[in-house]
Structure formats: C-alpha cells, structure tokens
Design a protein with these regions (language model features):
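Long, compositionally biased intrinsically disordered regions
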Residues: 1-2, 82-127
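Positively charged, polyanion-binding regions of nucleic-acid-associated proteins
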Residues: 5-30, 34
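Generic secondary-structure transition motif, activating predominantly at the C-termini of alpha-helices
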Residues: 18, 22, 36, 53, ...
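Charged low-complexity interaction tracts in eukaryotic proteins
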Residues: 54-95
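Residue-level signal for secondary-structure boundary elements
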Residues: 22, 26, 44, 57, ...
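Extended alpha-helical scaffold and adjacent linker segments that couple domains
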Residues: 2, 27, 36, 56, ...
Length: 127
C-alpha cells in the first residue's frame, strides 16, 4: 500500500498510481510537497495540495494535512468503494450507515469490502 512516487510528477500521475494500488495508499508529506513543487509545507501549501488532490478525485487522511515532511498520509480515490466507505465514516449519513453495515455484515459487500473497512477503521482510529 505504500505509494512509490519516484516517477510521479503530476497529480494525474498520482491518481494513476492510486488506481494501480487498489484505489488506496500511503505516502509521506515530503513526497506531496515535492509533487507540488513547493519548498516548505506551510499552511497555504498544504491547503493548495489538498485542493489539487480534491480536483483529481483524491481524498486524504488525516483530513488536515500535517506540516511535517516526514508525516505519513493516506490517499484514496473518492468515487470508489474504498472512498465511499471512508466518506461514510467521516461524513455520516443514512446511506453511509447502510453501506457500512453492509460491508461488515456481508450484505451488499464482499470480503474485499470488509477488509477495506477494517483497514479504514484502523486508520481513522489511529492504529
């Protein structure tokens, strides 16, 4: 799940890397800073990175990007099953509740969805 961004030079390339890694992965803030062609991870740069990720359909955890270049972040494609599960956890709705229950109970979800939900619970819980 670690994203190797050695050859990635654009946000579109980052999106492609996520697709190759099952729509989810983790990387360091220093790599995102470099992708953004910034020198530092100040508040404005972090906000711009978040906006650019969003423009490409990429979500991130934690919701507020950290300013430490060594901090690890999780990236996911928003309009995918894993993205929908993460959104269901972070932005509760009735539909999201049904999605979560279905993912863990086997109703409306498969084993892969249940495993992704387990991973999401670990990430959101900080474990």
């Amino acid at each position: 799940m670690d994203l190797f961004l050695g050859g990635v030079t654009t946000y579109a390339g980052l999106r492609d890397a996520l697709v190759e890694h099952g729509d989810f992965g983790r990387t360091g803030m220093g790599r995102l800073r470099d992708l953004h062609n910034a020198l530092r991870l100040g508040a404005k740069v972090r906000e711009e990175i978040s906006e650019r990720l969003n423009d490409h359909g990429i979500g991130h955890l934690p919701p507020a990007l950290p300013g430490n270049q060594d901090a690890e972040v999780r990236l996911y494609l928003k309009n995918t099953p894993v993205g929908e599960l993460i959104t269901a956890v972070l932005e509760p709705t009735r539909r999201g509740d049904e999605l979560l229950v279905g993912a863990v109970s086997g109703r409306g979800g498969d084993a892969e969805s249940a495993e992704k939900l387990r991973l999401i619970a670990q990430i959101v819980g900080g474990r």
